[in-house]
Amino acid sequence: MVHATSPLLLLLLLSLALVAPGLSARKCSLTGKWDNDLGSIMTIGAVNDNGEFNGTYITAVADNPGNITRSPLLGIQHKRACQPTFGFTVHWNFSESTSVFVGQCFVDKSGKEVLKTKWLQRLAVDDISDDWKATRVGNNDFTRQRTVEE
């Protein structure tokens, strides 16, 4: 029988107190390949010491789907948080429009990384009277693409 003040019990409790926070605070990383709920594919390169990153985006949805090409993205994230907030801009190569995304990188209870985002897309219009219809708003959830080894 183990007495309540046993050194073994104290050692066990101390070990659990030190290890448990690390188990629940898995860091979410933006770097890698992601796909969203619509089938778009995004690749984010390494995040530098300032939190800056670049990458590419291939949308699965467009007004002219036959013209879709890989488009560059440029962004920044907060580096200190385990589940960082971020923002990036996509310069669409196949249309006169630009999109900005803001979001947060989460690790869910099962350990899966998820990017929850909101976006604005600005379309080019020929006249200021059409400004009212030039900005679209939406949201996308991205999940990390599995690699062959997984």
From Swiss-Prot:
Glycans are attached at N54, N67, N93. PROSITE patterns: AVIDIN_1 (PS00577), AVIDIN_2 (PS51326). Residues 26-147 form the Avidin-like domain. InterPro entries: Avidin, Avidin-like_CS, Avidin-like_sf, Avidin/str, Avidin/Streptavidin-rel. Residues 1-24 form the signal peptide. One of its GO terms (molecular function) is biotin binding. Keywords: Biotin, Disulfide bond, Glycoprotein, Secreted, Signal. Pfam families: Avidin. Belongs to the avidin/streptavidin family. Forms a strong non-covalent specific complex with biotin. This is Avidin-related protein 1. It comes from Gallus gallus.
